[in-house]
Swiss-Prot record:
Gene source species: Proteus mirabilis (strain HI4320)
Name of the gene this protein is made from: rapA
Entry protein name: RNA polymerase-associated protein RapA
Domain Helicase C-terminal: 489-660
GO biological process, one term: regulation of DNA-templated transcription
Keyword Transcription regulation: yes
Boundaries of every Helicase ATP-binding domain copy: 163-333
UniProt superkingdom: Bacteria
Molecular function per GO: ATP binding; DNA binding; helicase activity; hydrolase activity, acting on acid anhydrides
Functional description taken from the UniProt entry: Transcription regulator that activates transcription by stimulating RNA polymerase (RNAP) recycling in case of stress conditions such as supercoiled DNA or high salt concentrations. Probably acts by releasing the RNAP, when it is trapped or immobilized on tightly supercoiled DNA. Does not activate transcription on linear DNA. Probably not involved in DNA repair.
C-alpha cells in the first residue's frame, strides 16, 4: 500500500504506542510519529510491521478533541480518508479527517483489532475459548465453593457447609465436638459466601492463642488471606486511615484486643462487615442481669453485622443458660426470654422421642402413631404411618419421610449444628503410655531453691513454673546450663526414637527453647533427623518443616513442636505422639492430641508421656488420666471441671510434695466427670445429630466432589495457561510441579504466584500430605486469576489460521466467532448460577451457513496451522469486505441463540427461587426459626434476578479467520 503524509497507521508489535501518523517518506523508509507517547519509529517501506487504520460505515470513531462520530460514509482524498457522519454529542452532520483521529485510540472489539492488524497467536485464541467455556461450566456447578478446599472430603462437614453457605446472611451456631472440624466448616462457609459474592468483608474474633491457627487454616486450606490485627498493627494503620479496620477486607483479632480499648471497639463497630465469626463462643459469659463485657462486645457486633457464625465445643447440656445466651446473639427477637426458651425446649422432647422410635426396628403402636399425627397435624400422614409398619423399602422410605417432617419442626435445628464422635464414624483408639522416671538431684536442688525464693509469687505462677523443671534449673544455672545431659526424659526419648526408626513421631513441649535444644541433642548424639516447629518461625519456614517431616524418603523422623507453634497443624500420617511435658489446662491437652486424632487417622494413637516422679508433672498426669480420662477419650467435661476445681488443682501443682487429700480430689473429679458424661449421653439430641450429620446427602456431596478431583480438563487447561502466560514449570514427581515466574510473562507479576515460586499438585491426597504444596482446583486463585487475566483483556481475541484440506477449494474462507451471552448484576445476587458469561461458537462460511454443530472445536483446532502476523494482516486486508458480510449475517443467528439461553436461565431461576421460597414459607408455618428477613431476601432476590436476566445482552468476544490451503 502506498504511503501518504498524514495517514494513520498502527504498530503490529507495539500497539501500546497508539495511533501513528506518517510524517516522512523517502525511497526506502517511512517515519511514523506516535503523538500519544511522543515517540518516532523508522520502518522499511517494504514489509513494515504496521497496519493501515481504516474505519468502515457503522463504526464510531473519536476525534482528538474528544467528540464521537457515527460513520455513514468514507471518502478517500489523495490517499487520505475523510469520515462523514453524525456527531453523537450534538446530533449534527460532521466530517472528520483521519489526521484528526484520537491519538490514544485503542481497538477493543475483536473485529477492530483484527482489521487493525493487532492479530494474536492461534494458541491464545484456543485458550480464550477454553477459558470462557470452562468458566461458564464452573459457575453452574452445584458444589461451587466446596471443591477447592485443601481438606479431606468429610460428609458431615460438607453437608453443614453446603446447607449454611448457600443461605442469605447465615446466622448459626457450629457446636461439633472437638476434632470434628468446626474451623474447617466455618472456613468452607466463609469461602462459599465470598465466592458467591454474598460476603466481602469478614471479621474473625478468636482467643489470642488461636489467632495464628486461624490465619494458617484460612490461608492453607481456603487460600483466604486474612490480616492479623494486634496493638502494633492497629496503631500503624491509624497513621494512614481514620478507621484502621477499613484498610483490610478480612481481619482476624483477639477478643481481648477488642475488649480492652473503647476507641478500638468503636472503630470495629463503625467499619462495615458482611460476616462475623467468633470461635470459643462458650467463653462469652452471660446472665440476664449481668452479662460480661466480652458478651456485650460480641452482642453489639452481632446486631450490626448481617451474618454471624459462632463456634463452640461445649454441649448445651453443660449449661442451658449459656447455650441460650449464644442463640440470643444469633436471633435476639426469637430468643428474648430464658424461661420461655426452657419451656419451648421441653416441648421439643416428644419430637426427638418420635424420631428415636422411627429409627428403631420396632413397629409403631397406636399411641405412638397418634402422637406423631398430632405433631404433624396440618398434613394427612395416615398413609405414611401405615407404610411405616410394613416391610422392606416402603417401610424405610415412609419412615424417612416422617423423620424429615419432624426435623423441619425441630426447635433450634436450623440455627444449631452439632455432631458428636459417637455419631460420626472413623476415629481411632487412643492409648496412653505413662513412663515414670526418677527426679534428678540437680532438679531437686533447683526446685528447693525456687520454693524458697517463690514465697512472694502467686500460687498460679508457682504451679505453672513447677511443670517445667528444666526451665527452673536454667534460671539458676544460666541459659546455657545443659539440663539435657542428666534429664532422664532425654535418654528415654533417644531410646524411643532409635527403637522406632520407621515411625514418624510428633514430640510436643510447652516452650520453643525446649524444642530447639532437643533437636540439637538428637542430631548430635544419635544423628536423628528432626524438624522443629515453633512460634518464632515464619509461615513459610513452618511449611518447610512440616513438609520435611511428611516426606517419606528423605524426611525427618521426628517433628519437635512448641505449644503455640503446633496450632492449626494436623499430622494424621503419624500415630506416635510424645508429650515431653504436660500443658496447664485440658483444652491444650486435647489440642495436642488433636494434632493426630482427626477424622482420617487410620491407626490407633500411641500417647507416650515420660514424667518425673514427685513433680507437678506427675500430679497433672494423674488428674488428666484418672480424674478426667482425658488421654484415652475426648473430654467435653474437662473445661467445666477445670474451672470448678481450679483453686484446688493449682494448690496441688504448686506443692507437689504436700498432696494430702489428692486421692479424694481425683475421686471427686472423676465422679463429676462420669455424672456429666452420663447427663450428656442421656441428653443427646438424636434429632439434632441427624440433622447436623446430613446422612446420605453429605455422602453424595463428598462423592460428587471426589468425582471432579483430578479433572483432566483442568490439568490440560492449567498447563496450557502456564505455557502461554510464561510461567516456568518443572516436574518434581508424578504429581508435583514447581511453578516459578519467568522474565517473559504476559504480566510482570502474576497474581497468586509467589516471587520465589510454589509447588502445586492436582491430587487432593498429595496436597494433604505435604504442607508446602498447593492444591490446584478450578477455585484456586492461580487458576481464577489466570482466567481473569485472559478474559479481562484482549488475549486471544482475534487470530488467523490456515486449514490444509484438499477437499475444499484453495482460498475458501471460514469465520469462527465466539459470542458471549451475559447479564450484569450486583455480585451478591450470584446471577452466574443461572446465566454465567456463556460462550456461543459459530463457524460460518461465506453463505452464512453455521457449521459449528458439525465441526467440534478441539478436533478442528488440531487441524489448523499458525500464520505469522505480517501474512495474517495481508490476508485480513484481502477479505475485509467478506468478513463484514459474515459478521452481519451472524447477528440474526446469534439473536436466536441468545434468546434461547436467556429464556432457559429465566425459567431455571424462577423454578429454583420459587421452590426455595415455597419451602421456607412452609417451614415458617411450623418452625419459628425461619427469620422473616430470609424469606424477604429470597422474594427480592427472585424479582431482581429476573429483572437483570431480562436485560441480558450478547457481544462478540473473539474472531478467527480460517483460510483453506493445499500446501
Amino acid at each position: 500500500m502506498p504511503f501518504t503524509l498524514g495517514q494513520r497507521w498502527i504498530s503490529d508489535t507495539e500497539s501500546e504506542l497508539g495511533l501513528g501518523t506518517v510524517v516522512a517518506i523517502d525511497a526506502r523508509m517511512v517515519t511514523l510519529l506516535f503523538p500519544a507517547c511522543g515517540e518516532n519509529r523508522l520502518y522499511s517501506r517494504h514489509d513494515a510491521p504496521i497496519t493501515r487504520v481504516m474505519f468502515n460505515v457503522g463504526d464510531t470513531v473519536t476525534s482528538h478533541e474528544g467528540w464521537k462520530l457515527a460513520i455513514d460514509n468514507v471518502v478517500e482524498d489523495n490517499g487520505l480518508l475523510i469520515y462523514h457522519g453524525v456527531r453523537l454529542d450534538t446530533e449534527e452532520p460532521a466530517q472528520l479527517r483521519e489526521v484528526f483521529l484520537d491519538n490514544k485510540l485503542t481497538f477493543n472489539k475483536p473485529q477492530d483489532r483484527l482489521f487493525a492488524g493487532q492479530i494474536d497467536r492461534m494458541d491464545r485464541f484456543a485458550l480464550r475459548y477454553r477459558a470462557r467455556k470452562f468458566m461458564s461450566e464452573q459457575f453452574k456447578q452445584a458444589q461451587s465453593g466446596l471443591r477447592g478446599i485443601r481438606a479431606s472430603l468429610i460428609p458431615h462437614q460438607l453437608y453443614i457447609a453446603n446447607e449454611v453457605g448457600k443461605r442469605h446472611n447465615p446466622r448459626v451456631l457450629l457446636a461439633d465436638e472437638v476434632g470434628l472440624g468446626k474451623t474447617i466448616e466455618a472456613g468452607m462457609i466463609i469461602h462459599q459466601q465470598i465466592m458467591d459474592g454474598r460476603a466481602e468483608r469478614v471479621l474473625i474474633i478468636v482467643p489470642e492463642s488461636l489467632q495464628h491457627q486461624w490465619l494458617v487454616e484460612m490461608l492453607r486450606r481456603f487460600n483466604l488471606r486474612f490480616s492479623l490485627f494486634d496493638d502494633s498493627r492497629y496503631s500503624e494503620s491509624l497513621l494512614d486511615s481514620d478507621n484502621p479496620f477499613e484498610t483490610e477486607q478480612m481481619i482476624i483479632c483477639s477478643l481481648d484486643f477488642v475488649r480492652k480499648n473503647k476507641q478500638r471497639f468503636e472503630h470495629l463497630v463503625e467499619a462495615t462487615w458482611d460476616m462475623l465469626v467468633v470461635d470459643e463462643a462458650h467463653h462469652l459469659v452471660w446472665s440476664e442481669k449481668a452479662p460480661s463485657r466480652e458478651y456485650q462486645v460480641i452482642e453489639t457486633l452481632a446486631e450490626a453485622i448481617p451474618s454471624v457464625l459462632l463456634l463452640t465445643a461445649t454441649p448445651e447440656q453443660l449449661g442451658q443458660e449459656s447455650h441460650f445466651a449464644r442463640l440470643r446473639l444469633l436471633d435476639p427477637n426469637r430468643f428474648h426470654d430464658y424461661n420461655e426458651f426452657i419451656n419451648e425446649q421441653q416441648k421439643y422432647r416428644p419430637v426427638a422421642d418420635a424420631v428415636t422410635i422411627l429409627l428403631s426396628e420396632d413397629d409403631l403402636n397406636n399411641e405412638q402413631q397418634n402422637s406423631i399425627s398430632e405433631m404433624i397435624s396440618e398434613q394427612d400422614i395416615e398413609p405414611l404411618l401405615k407404610a411405616s409398619n410394613t416391610q422392606g423399602e416402603e417401610r424405610t422410605k415412609s419412615r424417612q419421610a416422617l423423620i424429615h417432617m419432624l426435623m423441619d419442626r425441630h426447635g433450634t435445628g436450623r440455627l444449631l449444628f452439632r455432631n458428636t464422635r459417637s455419631g460420626v464414624k472413623g476415629f481411632p483408639n487412643r492409648l496412653l503410655h505413662a513412663i515414670k522416671m526418677p527426679l534428678p538431684t540437680q532438679y531437686q536442688t533447683a526446685i528447693k531453691v525456687a520454693e524458697i525464693m517463690a514465697a512472694k509469687k502467686s500460687l498460679e505462677v508457682r504451679a505453672k513454673e513447677m511443670l517445667y523443671p528444666e526451665r527452673i534449673y536454667q534460671e539458676f544455672e544460666g541459659e546455657n546450663a545443659t539440663w539435657w545431659n542428666f534429664d532422664p526424659r532425654v535418654e528415654w526419648l533417644l531410646g524411643f526414637l532409635t527403637a522406632n526408626r520407621h515411625e514418624k513421631v510428633l514430640v510436643i513441649c510447652a516452650q520453643a527453647a525446649t524444642a530447639l535444644q532437643l533437636e540439637q541433642v538428637l542430631r548430635e548424639r544419635e544423628g536423628i533427623r528432626a524438624a522443629v516447629f515453633h512460634e518464632g518461625m515464619s509461615l513459610l519456614e513452618r511449611d518447610r518443616a512440616a513438609a520435611y517431616f511428611a516426606s517419606e524418603e528423605e524426611g525427618a523422623q521426628v517433628l519437635l513442636c512448641s505449644e503455640i507453634g503446633s496450632e492449626g497443624r494436623n499430622f494424621q500420617f503419624a500415630n506416635q505422639l510424645v508429650m515431653f511435658d504436660l500443658p496447664f489446662n485440658p483444652d491444650l491437652l486435647e489440642q495436642r492430641i488433636g494434632r493426630l486424632d482427626r477424622i482420617g487417622q487410620n491407626r490407633d494413637i500411641d500417647i507416650s508421656v515420660p514424667y518425673l516422679e514427685g513433680t507437678a508433672q506427675s500430679v497433672l498426669l494423674r488428674w488428666y488420666h484418672e480424674g478426667l480420662d482425658a488421654f484415652e477419650h475426648t473430654c467435653p467435661t474437662g473445661r467445666t471441671i477445670y474451672d470448678n476445681e481450679y483453686d484446688a488443682l493449682v494448690n496441688y501443682l504448686a506443692q507437689p510434695n504436700e498432696l494430702g487429700d489428692f486421692d479424694k480430689f481425683i475421686v471427686s473429679c472423676r465422679k463429676q466427670h462420669d455424672e456429666m458424661k452420663l447427663k450428656l449421653e442421656q441428653g443427646r439430641d438424636r434429632l439434632l445429630e441427624m440433622h447436623s450429620n446430613g446422612g446420605e446427602v453429605g455422602v453424595e456431596l463428598a462423592n460428587k466432589i471426589a468425582e471432579q478431583d483430578n479433572d483432566p480438563d483442568l490439568v490440560n487447561f492449567a498447563l496450557n495457561l502456564f505455557d502461554i502466560v510464561g510461567i516456568n514449570q518443572e516436574d518434581r514427581s508424578d504429581s508435583l510441579i514447581v511453578l516459578t515466574p519467568s522474565d517473559h510473562m504476559l504480566v510482570p507479576d502474576f497474581p497468586g504466584l509467589p516471587q520465589d515460586g510454589c509447588t502445586i499438585t492436582f491430587d487432593r491426597e498429595h496436597a494433604l500430605s505435604r504442607e508446602d504444596t498447593q492444591f490446584i482446583s478450578w477455585e484456586h486463585p492461580i487458576i481464577r486469576n489466570g482466567l481473569d487475566l485472559v478474559l479481562s483483556g484482549d488475549t486471544g481475541s482475534c487470530a488467523v489460521s490456515l486449514l490444509k484440506n484438499k477437499a475444499l477449494p484453495v482460498g475458501t474462507l471460514l469465520v469462527e466467532l465466539i459470542y458471549v451471552v451475559e447479564a450484569q448484576a450486583p455480585k451478591h445476587l450470584h446471577l452466574t448460577r443461572f446465566l454465567p458469561a456463556t460462550p456461543v461458537r459459530l463457524l460460518l462460511d461465506l453463505k452464512g451457513n453455521n457449521l459449528a454443530s458439525q465441526v467440534e472445536f478441539e478436533s478442528f483446532n488440531r487441524q489448523l496451522n499458525a500464520v505469522n502476523r505480517h501474512t495474517s494482516s495481508k490476508l485480513v486486508n484481502a477479505v475485509q469486505n467478506e468478513v463484514h458480510h459474515v459478521l452481519k449475517a451472524s447477528e440474526s443467528l446469534m439473536e436466536a441463540e441468545a434468546k434461547t439461553l436467556i429464556e432457559q436461565a429465566k425459567q431455571e431461576a424462577d423454578n429454583a427461587l420459587t421452590h426455595e421460597l415455597s419451602r421456607l414459607e412452609a417451614l415458617r408455618a411450623v418452625n419459628p426459626n425461619i427469620r422473616d428477613d430470609e424469606v424477604e431476601a429470597i422474594e427480592n432476590e427472585r424479582t431482581h434476578i429476573l429483572n437483570h436476566l431480562d436485560e441480558a445482552t450478547w457481544r462478540l468476544d473473539a474472531i478467527r479467520l480460517i483460510v483453506v490451503t493445499h500446501q
